[in-house]
Amino acid sequence: MDPIRSRTPSPARELLPGPQPDGVQPTADRGVSPPAGGPLDGLPARRTMSRTRLPSPPAPSPAFSAGSFSDLLRQFDPSLFNTSLFDSLPPFGAHHTEAATGEWDEVQSGLRAADAPPPTMRVAVTAARPPRAKPAPRRRAAQPSDASPAAQVDLRTLGYSQQQQEKIKPKVRSTVAQHHEALVGHGFTHAHIVALSQHPAALGTVAVKYQDMIAALPEATHEAIVGVGKQWSGARALEALLTVAGELRGPPLQLDTGQLLKIAKRGGVTAVEAVHAWRNALTGAPLNLTPEQVVAIASHDGGKQALETVQRLLPVLCQAHGLTPQQVVAIASNGGGKQALETVQRLLPVLCQAHGLTPQQVVAIASNSGGKQALETVQRLLPVLCQAHGLTPEQVVAIASNGGGKQALETVQRLLPVLCQAHGLTPEQVVAIASNIGGKQALETVQALLPVLCQAHGLTPEQVVAIASNIGGKQALETVQALLPVLCQAHGLTPEQVVAIASNIGGKQALETVQALLPVLCQAHGLTPEQVVAIASHDGGKQALETVQRLLPVLCQAHGLTPEQVVAIASHDGGKQALETVQRLLPVLCQAHGLTPQQVVAIASNGGGKQALETVQRLLPVLCQAHGLTPEQVVAIASNSGGKQALETVQALLPVLCQAHGLTPEQVVAIASNSGGKQALETVQRLLPVLCQAHGLTPEQVVAIASHDGGKQALETVQRLLPVLCQAHGLTPEQVVAIASHDGGKQALETVQRLLPVLCQAHGLTPEQVVAIASHDGGKQALETVQRLLPVLCQAHGLTPQQVVAIASNGGGRPALETVQRLLPVLCQAHGLTPEQVVAIASHDGGKQALETVQRLLPVLCQAHGLTPQQVVAIASNGGGRPALESIVAQLSRPDPALAALTNDHLVALACLGGRPALDAVKKGLPHAPALIKRTNRRIPERTSHRVADHAQVVRVLGFFQCHSHPAQAFDDAMTQFGMSRHGLLQLFRRVGVTELEARSGTLPPASQRWDRILQASGMKRAKPSPTSTQTPDQASLHAFADSLERDLDAPSPMHEGDQTRASSRKRSRSDRAVTGPSAQQSFEVRVPEQRDALHLPLSWRVKRPRTSIGGGLPDPGTPTAADLAASSTVMREQDEDPFAGAADDFPAFNEEELAWLMELLPQ
């Protein structure tokens, strides 16, 4: 029988003074071992002795000799190694081949979690202690194991679910049980404790020292503490923060709690200690790093080594290689930053001189996890990929500039021929798939699943590429294969909706969450499937859906929001955070800052809504009091992606731009009120003098170019291409400005430079026509489509080049042209329309949607409701044709009492006059209309038919103009066609909101713009209030109709596909009156739409398009977005200011006869 050993603790097991390695943390209930020979000698060890440490090795080695380390590894149970290390790495990060010293220190701390003492301590202890015999079996049985009482603790008795208990390793459950009561008392939930159990040592540290942590880090949340503690050196990192937080909060860094926790979570204990030790050197000369830069570098695996390397190499890289400190920081601020910096120092000259890359491209490649390996692979494969596979250096750089760039480049080299030859993909599509984190895996999955998804599930190769071209594309493709049948058959989604959900970062999780929550959100919360799809179709869709399920009742019942507004907030990247911030800040912003709930929703309904709301709370008083902005202007700036940065930049640059550059605050606001407003403002500050002095532009033209999404890039491209386009291609500066003054101006200018000679020489277009096509959002895509389809449409479909140009010269020109190619035969042969009528419908913003709606509703309107095809065409040919036709169908199918008295002819005339806004305005009740009707009846008691034009004739005249193939001749031809004098025709047009100049040139404004003029001329629309005026709720409701007026594309029904053009048309409608002079107006045959003063940006402009992932181009404006599916857009736009402020300023008031004509059209 084995002898009973003494329980006197060995010196190696005694707690040492000072900080303990993770796994040997002291606890409050740790007692002192009884002396040898005591009454408890020989009994099994007390469980309290092992609660915060893992089991001891069966037998210590005599000394740390040559073979002792291998013995230690044999004794080490691999299951004890904390896998949270790998969870904390990027999902497709680079695989580093070098192990830094500090990283090895942390690996050793993981080994110490097995209760093995440090090697130096073992040398000292075992030298004075002879080797022990093999432990007795009974002693081994006393150790905690899967079969021991410690491992069999049932945590369900403490309220943990079975699933939560299974997530906790058996050997850790006793530690969880020991500290459960203390942690729960500190406010930690069961889920928090389960997460913290990933690193058992942190359980005791947090339980014992939570009060000290809150004292040192008062803003720390439970989630933040758990986020640090569950890391592989989390307990030590928290201990380090307790020691150094006070000094790091003071000069020179003055870090806040969030920054301190970020360093501790991502960089570990070594990073915290390094920041503390080197804080003065990092922020002083010659490095002069900002606190934000120090945090960025330190907040990664290997942060300590990166900080050390920055101190050594930053001066060298800046002085000898021409990099900026910002570029050096960008390279260092990733996992493996040390190795990346050293590789940039070594390879930058080679890549630039021998391979033709720019320093910026080298920095882009290096500024990712695994930058070292990516740079080396670019050096090796760039010649091969370009010469043998036909890629451009830019495409190679795009592939390499992601985590895992090395593997992606190697996979492109291997699979590009296969994917192109066997699967029909283009090199551009292969590059798009590869240019993301995890590009290697995505390419391999496309190779495996493309045939299956296309043949068995009916997807197109383009849809498969869209799904794969995101982070996590591999998983998304596999999930689409698994869930597409279920989501379509059981939940009623379309394949297109499934693709939309999957084509984002986290598409796999979003699809699974839609499967789980779609029935709940629809049945319990009243959402439509389209709204659920809209929420899910963004990065982080899973989290957004779960948050909508949780917060929708609260936001609606406690805060008065509508479900549509909640959907609008959630339907963006970061929707979860935006919803939570609205819940928290809505009362504050409304009560303390005077904003309306609608304005708060508008700010939140963008990517980065959370940060924008927090910045509005902070800067609204400053911008209004110190800089003279109005709350409306602050909201306009904030209501874009990147609103936070735009607001901060306005605060910084408004005085400079106004005082040094002569801009007005209104112009600064106009520039800032777009996605990328920060960058646009900075570029205006930098390039305004150059563009004005060297290129002859006016400040107003510079502002016009900058006042769009992508304003920075557009300004830089104008600086570069203006001389070329004017000297080599014969354009005027005004034409260049017109092209650049739209979303995607950069791409449009570059495409004009490339295609102008081709379109003019090979296709017979004039430079003016090319400029007209390019001068819209999506001009690049429209020009490329004209080049491709002009021969087809003219030869196969009988259109003229002028008609093709007319279709292309609108927002969404590309989808309109493609739809004409597809539907022209159908509409002419099956529905009896003429090619001229099809062209008239297509030649407006949203032409694609209007054509599809005519195809769908023409039989219904004609057969079931008695309208003529000419009437349908007249409604569809006025801009905003789709919503106008849908409103007519809805009224004829389910009459609204406000419109019930109108005949079909009256309804058609009203729809032609003002589209859906006119019909909606009458339904809601026109302000002042009853008094106006009475006044008119009193003053003109006898209204005879000769005093007013026949309403049917108005429809015929409008339809004639819209379908005329030569607009400039339409006026003269109309006089002949209808037997009208010049004065009579002008009088008719004036009654429908058209000026003499517009009528004579044949370029009629959209219906909603004409309706706006009619309302103002008739006195039924209030003048624009001053920015400082306020409205009572009664006033606001009285004039609600005016706030709902839309331009060409009105808010679609949530049951229909959204108009991508909606955002672009509103953007384009901003008047250059505040930012451009008359010189910006072009004399093209195709009208350049009026633009609106950016000061009064309607909140509905905040709906943004998804970004493209490759090629640098903007999304095609005709592409439907998930956001358009949300009914929230309609409600949002009901709060908008009139989108055509100033459009009717010069339109004179109606006289009494004109009022009488109008009143005869309206319900009495």
Curated annotation (Swiss-Prot):
Cryptic repeat repeats lie at residues 255-288. Residues 1-68, 128-152, 1048-1091 are annotated as: Disordered. By varying the BSR in each core repeat, DNA-binding domains can be generated that target specific DNA sequences and thus act as transcription factors. By combining the central DNA-binding domain with the catalytic domain of the restriction endonuclease FokI, TALE-nuclease (TALEN) enzymes able to target specific dsDNA sequences can be created that enable eukaryotic genome modification. Other potential uses as transcriptional repressors, for transposon targeting, DNA methylation or histone tail modifictions are also possible. GO terms for cellular component: extracellular region; host cell nucleus. Residues 1135-1164 are annotated as: Acidic activation domain AAD. Changing residue 1021 to T: No loss of HR activity. No loss of HR activity. Reduced HR activity. Its main location: secreted. GO terms for molecular function: sequence-specific DNA binding. It is found in: Secreted; Host nucleus. Residues 131-141 have a biased composition (Basic residues). It holds the Pfam family TAL_effector. Cryptic repeat - repeats lie at residues 225-254. Core repeat 17. repeats lie at residues 867-886. InterPro entries: TAL_effector_rpt, TALE. A motif (Nuclear localization signal NLS3) lies at residues 1104-1107. Keywords: DNA-binding, Host nucleus, Hypersensitive response elicitation, Plasmid, Repeat, Secreted, Transcription, Transcription regulation, Virulence. A motif (Nuclear localization signal NLS1) lies at residues 1021-1024. One of its GO terms (biological process) is symbiont-mediated perturbation of host programmed cell death. Gene3D superfamilies: 6.10.140.500. Core repeat repeats lie at residues 289-322, 323-356, 357-390, 391-424, 425-458, 459-492, 493-526, 527-560, 561-594, 595-628, 629-662, 663-696, 697-730, 731-764, 765-798, 799-832, 833-866. A motif (Nuclear localization signal NLS2) lies at residues 1067-1070. The N-terminus is responsible for protein export from the bacteria. The central DNA-binding region is composed of 17.5 tandem core repeats with 1 base-specifying residue (BSR residue 13, also called repeat variable diresidue, RVD, residues 12 and 13) which recognizes 1 base in the target DNA; 10.5 or more repeats are required for strong gene expression (tested using an artificial TALE, PubMed:19933107). The BSR is the only residue which contacts DNA in a sequence-specific manner. The number and order of core repeats determines its specificity for different resistance alleles in plants. Forms a homodimer in the plant cell cytoplasm, prior to nuclear import. Interacts with the plant cell importin alpha-1 (Caimp alpha-1) and importin alpha-2 (Caimp alpha-2) via the nuclear localization signal NLS2, but not via NLS3. Belongs to the transcription activator-like effector (TALE) family. Avirulence protein. Acts as a transcription factor in C.annuum plants. In susceptible plants lacking the Bs3 resistance gene induces expression of a number of genes, including genes homologous to a family of auxin-induced genes, alpha-expansin genes, pectate lyase, anthocyanidin glucoside rhamnosyl transferase and at least one transcription factor, UPA20. Their expression leads to plant hypertrophy in mesophyll cells, probably mainly mediated by UPA20. This is Avirulence protein AvrBs3.
